[in-house]
Regions:
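Non-catalytic alpha-helical scaffolds and adjoining flexible linkers that form interface surfaces
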Residues: 1-201
Length: 201
């Protein structure tokens, strides 16, 4: 079953693993019964797929994924905020942590930032050249810093307006595409869901 979190005993054959024992911990029914949640959860799993190689293990990233699925399943916070937070945790867990406290080029402390470098994965100060990146509002930059600093289960109180959500989506989509060189297919469905929601407002 898709999205089934469990404890398994695996036996490795010549090329594939076979499950010899298993215990289901959570099947995340709330995600499976809702198209939007199912699409978001599929996106989370796709991010894992594009950011890791076969047989690679990453306990930190696994914990972030399971936490995100629990939060998504329980309606604990805004789905879009959760996706952006997980994307940031993904970058950090795979060695591409965003540098949002210091200029990613000259390393000067940032008191203000209006540009994110895709090449260096971080904020750029006003003294350094701004190229191959994305302009960003100060409000969105502060939200990025917040999501980068706090754990997933501590962001449920965060409220973000639609303009900042769109800016965050654009920035993280560009960063992930630039770093991992692959685009999750579920993004197409997410774009359709977002467009449908915008038309209904």
């Amino acid at each position: 079953m898709p999205l089934t979190f469990g404890e398994y005993v695996l036996f490795k054959g010549r090329g594939l693993y076979t499950i010899s024992e298993g215990k289901i911990v959570n099947s995340f029914r709330g995600c499976l019964d809702d198209l939007e949640k199912l699409t978001y959860s599929t996106y989370l799993c796709e991010l894992i797929d594009i950011s890791m190689v076969d047989d690679e293990s990453n306990a930190v990233l696994f914990k972030e994924l399971v936490t995100s699925l629990y939060l998504l399943n329980s309606n604990a916070l805004d789905n879009e905020i959760l996706m952006r937070a997980f994307e940031i945790k993904l970058l950090k867990a795979t060695g591409y942590a965003l540098d949002l406290e210091n200029c990613c080029k000259c390393k000067r402390r940032l008191s203000y930032c209006d540009y994110i470098s895709l090449a260096y994965s971080g904020g750029v100060c006003n003294r350094c050249e701004k190229s191959y990146g994305i302009p960003i509002s100060s409000s969105t930059y502060n939200i990025l810093r917040y999501l980068n600093f706090y754990s997933l289960d501590n962001i449920y109180k965060l409220k973000i307006n639609d303009n900042i959500k769109k800016e965050l989506y654009s920035i993280m989509k560009s960063l992930i595409g630039s770093i991992y060189q692959r685009r999750p297919k579920s993004l197409d469905m997410l774009d359709i869901i977002k467009e449908s929601g915008d038309k209904n407002e």
